[in-house]
Amino acid sequence: MQFTFEQIFIAMLLTLFAGFSTAIGSIIAFFSRKDDLRVLSLGLGFSAGVMIYISFMEILPTALKDFKNHYDSHWAELLGLACFFGGILISLLIDKLIPEDVNPHEPKEDLSELKICPLPQKGQNPPKFHPGEKLHQINTKALKRTGIFTALAIAIHNFPEGFATFISSLDNLTLGIAIAIAVAIHNIPEGLAVSLPIYHATGDKKKAFIYSALSGFAEPLGAFVGALILLPFIGDLTLAISFAVIAGIMVFISLDELLPAAKTYDKAHDSLYGLIAGMAIMALSLNLLGQ
């Protein structure tokens, strides 16, 4: 199966768009507090709805159809399901390899509400504060290190997402655009997770922004590696395997990352409303476009 330069270029652009949305999260970190981020609950729920719907209603069925071009129905379904759960396993292993204290998807105290204060050096008096004041003495070097390791953790997570966006965009531009938007929404709070500790530790907006943007660079890198490895061999069977694995990765991301993160910013049932809206809009758009 051959792809034109235009197809590859557009797929890479969509992956770049999805990856560098971490920079948007970085900018939000400079101006917003947690209480101002209720819209993230809707957005993350919406992103999860898009990913779950596409995975089960479009990508996995497409993979099974392609498998059936090479195997009988029984073996095609078994192979498709094996690749689907293989995608989940890959995501799970990546998640387990990252320590909890730097994993951006593990719950931790919201840094935006902390009053940052360096630990006193030897011979210095501790800082004074009034009873009841919420003051956290935080070693700014440790805080900065947390932000950097979080950036590395997010980069590892984003690598397979970049591959998923790129391959989907090559085969079906409509699906690729939907996935790119969903991944971009998902990356915004990840940019926050990187930017907040670095910004609070250093007071340097530029440095916090750069680290957030670089953490998203893994997505186009994942697309580039996928292109180098798979493009020479892409056919129905390769796409079938890729799509089934991608469906598993996207379902894991939705259930393990997006929905829990959406609940963090939730008020009432915002995350649920976003989830339903994402599914409904995706279903309607695919139907109208004849997918």
Swiss-Prot record:
The keyword Transport applies. It catalyses: Zn(2+)(in) = Zn(2+)(out). Fe(2+) binds at N158, E161, N187, E190, E219. It is a multi-pass membrane protein. It comes from the Bacteria. Coiled coil: none annotated. It is found in: Cell inner membrane. PANTHER family: ZINC TRANSPORTER ZUPT, ZINC/IRON TRANSPORTER. This is Zinc transporter ZupT. It comes from Campylobacter jejuni subsp. jejuni serotype O:2 (strain ATCC 700819 / NCTC 11168).
